[in-house]
Amino acid sequence: MRFDVITLFPEFFATPLRIGLVGKALEQGIAEVHCTNPRDFATDKHRRVDDEPYGGGVGMVLKPEPFFAAVASLPRLDPCEIILLTPQGQPLNQALLQELAQKAQLILLCGQYEGFDERIRQHLATREVSLGDFVLTGGEIPALALINGVVRLLPGTVGKIDSLRSESFETGLLEYPQYTRPPEFQGHKVPPVLLSGDHRAIARWRLQQQLVRTWRRRPDLLAKRPLTPEEQQLLAEGLAEQHTDVEEQDRCL
């Protein structure tokens, strides 16, 4: 898969793209990332990529010519998306990452200053994506997040496919709690079921924990995911058990 990042700060991506699973995926050729500076396509002697907004206002607006020219200079693979990173865009979530992972090429437009000339938004970008309801100094951090999230879904990046299937959001639920050695630390014990060797009981416990954790932390996810009768029962039992545990802790205080 090919990523092309249109950015005024190509050096921003150097170190993050060399480390971890993403770095290994790039080394193995699973994906490739190319950075293009729109300043190289500026049309004046000062290589300006921004100008004052028509109608007045604060800040500077990114000009259309350098961005259109930068994108036009790129080789194209099909299917391709040209993504503008903006707080006004579609929220980046796991479902969108999975959709984008099916593309052959993603071109990411990183903004700076007061934002983009509207013609970039309307006539160049094919999609707008937001990292969340907050404003950053530029689109580079959202671009890194998107690249990371997509690359790890590409075949060969993550060793065990089951690792992806059991993660938060893959099944519409948050991930279950994880434990490792030692079995007891500072008086806090690993749940006995995880030490039992009973794989069916472990799977049931994990699903119950996912349901309870999602209900408590992200109830909006459950609103989008109808529960089976078994899941409804597991959720009710899990909530009841946690309520009992809280009451017992209160009595010990």
UniProtKB/Swiss-Prot annotation:
SUPFAM superfamilies: alpha/beta knot. It catalyses: guanosine(37) in tRNA + S-adenosyl-L-methionine = N(1)-methylguanosine(37) in tRNA + S-adenosyl-L-homocysteine + H(+). One of its GO terms (cellular component) is cytosol. The keyword DNA-binding does not apply. The keyword Iron-sulfur does not apply. It comes from the Bacteria. Keywords: Cytoplasm, Methyltransferase, S-adenosyl-L-methionine, Transferase, tRNA processing. GO terms for molecular function: tRNA (guanine(37)-N1)-methyltransferase activity. One of its GO terms (biological process) is tRNA N1-guanine methylation. Its EC number is 2.1.1.228. Specifically methylates guanosine-37 in various tRNAs. Belongs to the RNA methyltransferase TrmD family. This is tRNA (guanine-N(1)-)-methyltransferase.
